[in-house]
Design a protein with these regions (language model features):
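Helix-start (N-cap) detector for alpha-helical repeat units in TPR-like alpha-solenoids
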Residues: 54-55, 87-89, 122-123, 156-157, ...
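Structural signature of tandem alpha-helical TPR/SEL1-like repeats
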Residues: 35-42, 67-79, 101-113, 135-147, ...
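N-terminal leader/linker segments that initiate helical-solenoid repeat arrays
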Residues: 18-55, 59, 66-68, 75, ...
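Structural marker of alpha-solenoid helical repeat scaffolds
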Residues: 49-50, 83, 117, 151, ...
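Alpha-helical adaptor scaffolds
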Residues: 157, 161-168, 177, 190-207, ...
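Terminal, low-structured helical/coil segments at or just beyond the last alpha-helical repeat
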Residues: 229, 233-283
Length: 283
């Protein structure tokens, strides 16, 4: 299905380019900058085979990466390198892609290469911190985050990752502060507010957690089933079974398996709650 869609887009683009005098690589980059990643892939595919082949592979790789096509992205990053793409950003982008594919040691090689070439760029340190976090090396992750924030003190994702590290080290007050900073620097990073609420539940501050989760419900994020699950959990600990079961029912209808289990075991059979496993680094 993806192939047929791409074939249609390529046919359309060929006629469009013929009439507008734009090069395929120019159009591909325009589509990428505008967030039209499928169209970018189609235009870059037309550009491959022309003089801009190496650049087109890199552009197509970036679009695949944005769409979550990590294997296709890595293949195109490698093709870009083979065809002579020499921009230092290749190492950073390919390293990030390898992290997404859990190729951590290979990712480290690319990121360290980029760090050697561009030692003053905050994203390189941030992604090395991400790699260490994925390897459960919290202290090493925090060291890279110190470097990240020394270069860019407004790097919202770095505060978010530092908060995740702190939470896993049970330094909850510091984690709460960093989730708040992440949200201040990027108000769209609603996962920061969500994770703060989850932490507050673990700290027994149920009313504060419910307040944050109720705000999130109104903001209707794409993880609303999790919001409802955890608000149900907070209500359960406050002995509001009716409220808890209402939230779990709605969460279950949205596909949350833990909510489905709670409806059966806690609301139906009056058993004890088995809390959902906490994770703090999802975006």
């Amino acid at each position: 299905m993806r192939f047929l869609k791409s074939l249609f887009l390529i046919s359309f683009l060929c006629s469009f380019l013929w009439s507008n005098g734009q090069s395929p690589i120019q159009l591909a980059q325009q589509h990428y900058d505008a967030g039209r990643y499928d169209q970018c892939i189609a235009a870059a595919s037309v550009a491959i085979g022309e003089e801009a082949g190496a650049e087109a592979y890199f552009c197509r790789a970036n679009a695949h990466h944005k769409l979550g096509h990590f294997s296709e992205a890595l293949e195109d990053y490698d093709r870009a390198r083979i065809h002579g793409f020499s921009d230092d950003e290749l190492y950073l982008h390919r390293g990030i892609c390898k992290i997404s594919l859990m190729m951590y040691e290979a990712a480290r090689i690319d990121l360290m290469q980029h760090l050697e070439l561009k030692p003053e760029e905050a994203p390189t340190y941030y992604w090395l911190a991400t790699l260490e976090y994925m390897n459960m090396e919290n202290k090493a992750s925090l060291r890279y985050l110190e470097e990240t924030l020394a270069i860019d003190s407004a790097y919202a994702d770095a505060y978010y990752l530092r908060a995740a590290n702190m939470a896993e080290m049970n330094r909850n007050n510091l984690a709460l502060e960093d989730f708040q900073l992440a949200l201040e620097y990027n108000p769209k990073l609603l996962r920061a507010k969500f994770n703060a609420a989850v932490l507050l539940i673990g700290m027994g501050q149920f009313e504060n957690a419910i307040e944050l989760l109720s705000e999130l419900q109104l903001e209707n994020p794409d993880f609303i089933s999790e919001v409802l699950y955890y608000r149900g959990e907070a209500l359960y600990y406050m002995h509001d079974m009716e409220g808890a079961c209402t939230d779990w029912k709605e969460s279950a209808q949205l596909g949350d398996r833990d909510a489905q289990q709670n409806l059966k075991k806690v609301c139906g059979e009056k058993g004890k709650l088995k809390s959902k496993k906490r994770t703090y680094f999802a975006f």
